[in-house]
Structures are given as structure tokens and as C-alpha cells.
Regions:
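Conserved beta-strand termini and adjacent loop/short-helix elements that scaffold enzyme active sites
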Residues: 11, 83-87, 269, 329-331
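Generic structural signal for residues in well-ordered beta-strands
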Residues: 8, 80-82, 326
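Conserved NTP/Mg2+-binding pocket subregion across the NTase superfamily
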Residues: 40-169
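Short alpha-helix plus adjacent loop in nuclease-associated cores
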Residues: 332-337
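Active-site-proximal alpha-helix that buttresses catalytic centers in soluble enzyme cores
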Residues: 263-329
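Residues at beta-strand starts and edge strands
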Residues: 24-26, 76-78, 237, 264
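Active-site nucleotide-donor binding segment shared across nucleotidyl transfer reactions
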Residues: 2-26, 31-38
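Conserved nucleotidyltransferase catalytic core and NTase-mimicking acidic/glycine-rich helix/loop elements
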Residues: 115-260
Length: 337
């Protein structure tokens, strides 16, 4: 036990294979009440003590304390990917990286609190594919720069802060990173489409790959070869792996754009400023109009239907965005809390 730590969870490939000899690294998520330099050092020391008592596969121990999909030579190293968050950091991660945290929630390899009990990701939404951290655009940007964006704690006397860095893609990571991208994008889309937090089956993975890529079988065959290399813990991948990744992401982005057209978009909007915009509480007791003189909305489209509370400020705001009068609903009135 380490004082301040409330949760330790093993996530990633080990929770599916149960075989240390067949994984690239052992992913461990640690949640603490507070992040300190001492806590990070103590956690590393604890990992070293455990592995020294129970030598694993006659490999040299390597502790990767960065946040990101960087891999090391699994034939030489037993890598422990140690990811430490404080409670606030975990909440931020769950909000900004829902794909990762949603996946971690499936793990039953934990001590202390389950990750979902600390702060849950309830579902994957279509907007996550466009706005969340490590979305397809972020991946494509990293591939074109030949770098992987990672984060690492910077420890100083006064504080511990998380800084963004870039790791140059080497011959191993260009294949590992592309596999990570394709595998995660397909699995994340499957979670959204099925509305279930499950890993897609091998059969359905192939079907989704071909659906997304418009039945591009040559690309599918290249990915299957890449997958075999990963299973065999390859240390070097072809330069063409990057092209595979870029082509798949291009397909995926177009596929998502087409999918997004099938769904209705809901927009929640607060009323515009009023003449009593003085940081006092309005509630239902006061009913001022909005300052229309300061509003010059430039809209490419009008919305219909639009729902509004019966208050003047809400009705006037709603009329700026639609051709028809808004539908009035009492439930949208500001609460007198």
C-alpha cells in the first residue's frame, strides 16, 4: 500500500491475454488523492521491488511513466506503463479522452475503487470522434509530423505539472502506432454504434474495416499482415505502415462525415445578454429583454423546431436562430435555486 492511492487498475492487452510473454507492455492506471514527486518515485520503487522478487521472463524492467501509445522492444524489456492521475486529473481525462477511459472501465483487475466509481464515462457519442483527445484528426496530424504526442509529469520543488511532448516515431513505433490507430478507431466506432462497452469480435472487426474503407481489400490485407507482426512482437515495421495509417484515417473521416448526416443535431443554447447583465441572479422573478443591438448572428442555416422557455430573453434569442416562432415549454424556465 502507498498512502494517498485510492485505486490501482491493470488495463490493456493483459486483461485479455493473461500472458505476460504476449504483450508489448503492462498498463497500470493509478489514481491518487494528490500528485507529488514523492508519490511518483514511491510508485516506481514499489514496481521495481515487486519485479525483483518475481523476475519476469528474464527481461530488463523498463518503467514508462508517460501518457501516450509509445512502445518499447518487448523482446528485451518488460515494460510497465505506469499512468498516475489524481482525482481531478482522472475526471479531466474521462471528459477529454472518453475513448480511453471507457475502455479502461471494462477491467476487473483492480484494487481499491473501480475507475467507474471515481468518475464514469457513461457512453461514447458521435461528437467525441470530432472533439475528444486522440481523435482521428489528431492521429493524422501526428503521422504527418512523424511524431507521437505524449504527456509527461514535470517535477519541480513547488509543483508537479503535466507537459505535452513529442516522441519521434521509430521503426518499431510506426507499426505499433498505426495498429493502435486502426484498432482503436474501429473499436470506438463499434462501441458508439452498438451502444455497448465491448471489444469488437475479430469477424466483425474485419466487416467494419471493409465497410469503412469501401471494401478496400488490398488495404485490409496489409493491415492483417501488420497485425501478425504485432502479435510476433516485431521490432521493425515498413515505411509503408505510415501510408496504411494515413489512408485508413482518410477513409474513416469520410465515413464519419457520412454517418453524421444520418443523425439529428441538438443544440443547447443559453439566452443572449440582457440589460441587467450585472452578475446578479435573474431567475423567473425578473423578465428583461435581450440587448439585440449587440447581436449580429451570422448563420448559414436556420433551426427548426426550436424550443424556448416562456421568458422574453429566451424567446427573443430563439427567434434569432429560426424562421418560425419557437415552441414554448415551461420546463425550460430558469430554476429559482
Amino acid at each position: 500500500k502507498i498512502e494517498g492511492i485510492i485505486s490501482v487498475t491493470i488495463v490493456g492487452s493483459f486483461t485479455r491475454t493473461y500472458d505476460l510473454d504476449k504483450i508489448g507492455d503492462l498498463d497500470i492506471v493509478i489514481i491518487s488523492k494528490k500528485i507529488t514527486g514523492k508519490l511518483i518515485k514511491t510508485s516506481k520503487k514499489k514496481i521495481k521491488n515487486i519485479t525483483s522478487k518475481y523476475p519476469i521472463l528474464n527481461k530488463k524492467l523498463k518503467i514508462n511513466d508517460t501518457f501516450g501509445p509509445v512502445k518499447y522492444d518487448a523482446t528485451k524489456y518488460f515494460t510497465v506503463h505506469m499512468m498516475i492521475y489524481d482525482i481531478k486529473g482522472h475526471i479531466d481525462h474521462a471528459i477529454n479522452s472518453p475513448f480511453t477511459c471507457y475502455d479502461w472501465q471494462r477491467s476487473n483487475w483492480f484494487k481499491g475503487k473501480k475507475l467507474k466509481a471515481i468518475f464514469p464515462v457513461e457512453n461514447i457519442y458521435l461528437r467525441d470522434f470530432f472533439e475528444a483527445r486522440r481523435n482521428s484528426k489528431d492521429y493524422l496530424r501526428d503521422l504527418k509530423k512523424n511524431k507521437i504526442s505524449i504527456r509527461k509529469y514535470q517535477i519541480s520543488i513547488k509543483k508537479v505539472s503535466l507537459k505535452k511532448r513529442y516522441y519521434k516515431i521509430n521503426t518499431k513505433n510506426r507499426g505499433e502506432f498505426v495498429f493502435h490507430i486502426v484498432n482503436n478507431l474501429i473499436n470506438n466506432y463499434n462501441k458508439f454504434y452498438t451502444n455497448k462497452n465491448i471489444k469488437v469480435s475479430s469477424k466483425n472487426f474485419g466487416k467494419l474495416f471493409l465497410k469503412i474503407t469501401k471494401n478496400d481489400r488490398p488495404l485490409w490485407n496489409k493491415f492483417k499482415y501488420l497485425s501478425k507482426q504485432k502479435i510476433n512482437l516485431s521490432t521493425s515495421y515498413s515505411n509503408k505502415s505510415i501510408l496504411l495509417g494515413e489512408k485508413f484515417i482518410t477513409y474513416f473521416n469520410q465515413f464519419l462525415r457520412n454517418e453524421s448526416k444520418k443523425y439529428k443535431r441538438l443544440v443547447f443554447l443559453r439566452h443572449a445578454k440582457t440589460f441587467v447583465n450585472d452578475k446578479t441572479f435573474l431567475g423567473q422573478g425578473r423578465n428583461p429583454e435581450i440587448l439585440k443591438i449587440k447581436l449580429k448572428p451570422k448563420l448559414k442555416e436556420k433551426y427548426n423546431p426550436i424550443y424556448s422557455s416562456p421568458l422574453k430573453r429566451s424567446i427573443s434569442t430563439a427567434k434569432l436562430f429560426g424562421k418560425k416562432n419557437p415552441i414554448i415549454n415551461e420546463y425550460l424556465s430558469e430554476i429559482n435555486y
